[in-house]
Each structure stands twice: as C-alpha cells, then as structure tokens.
Amino acid sequence: MSEKIKVAVLVSGGGTNLQALIDKEADGQIPDAHIVKVIASREDAFALERAAKAGIETAVAKEPQQVMEELQKSGADMIVLAGYMKVLPKEIIERYRNKIINIHPSLIPKYCGKGFYGKRVHKAVLEGGEKESGATVHFVDEGVDTGEIILQEKVPVLEGDTPD
C-alpha cells in the first residue's frame, strides 16, 4: 500500500466541513488521505476543538508567514480550505499549486467571489429565487473562487428553507 496523502485543513469557524472530513476519514471513506494538522485563523474557532477531540494536531496562524511555517512543519502534501475566511497569499498558492482545494457553498459560478461565504451565500440563493443550490469543490488559484472545478453537488431549494 502506498503512503497516504498528508492533508492540512485550514479553518476559521465552527468546522462543520472539517467534521465531515474527520468522520469520512474515520469511516474509511477517504482511504488514501490522512488529516495531519488543522490550522485556524482565529483562536476561538470551534473547529480547533473538533480537531483536538479527533486527536489531530492544531495551530493558530493569523499571518501568512505563520500559515506557511505551520504547513511546512506539518509535512502536508495537500491543503483543504474548509470554511477558511482568508485569501491565501501568492507564495502559498505557488508552493502548493494544484494541491489546494476549497469547499464553496454554492454552484460556482453563481454566488461566489469576494463577499460570498457561509450564510451570506445561502441568503443570496434564497433572495435570488433559485430552485437549486449546492456545493463546489475546486482548486485554489490566485483569484477568489476562480480555480478549476473538481466536482459539484446539487440540492433542491425547498419552500421554507432558511440560510441556516
């Protein structure tokens, strides 16, 4: 068996996407990857508690240089942005070209780019009268939500749906 891909997950908030990744890894649904570190942009990110509970090493890195140092220390082969609310600097994108993926809560190209994150996306979808929404996983490039799309999953927007 080949060595597993070492994944660092960057977070800023509650960590629901992180928890989904932790659960999938624990269930054997991500057999080729292992989360080696969770790096948060804020000390109060609940995602840090989720990671600690799962036995995953954590760090808080507020500045780009700190993020790069933590990534290098982790030995990560790949980076997943799971609710990470900062734009990565060019140096990190260049160092990890085509090895950084983002989970975005809309069907790109709709409701993406600067200012579209979290509940703001869901609110805009509802206000736009959309009949479907979903999530997009894409590679990260120098733009905001402009990288190559890896996959999308559609879900219907139901009457009575809320941004929550």
Across the structure, where does each feature detected by a protein language model lie?
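One-carbon transfer enzymes
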Residues: 1-164
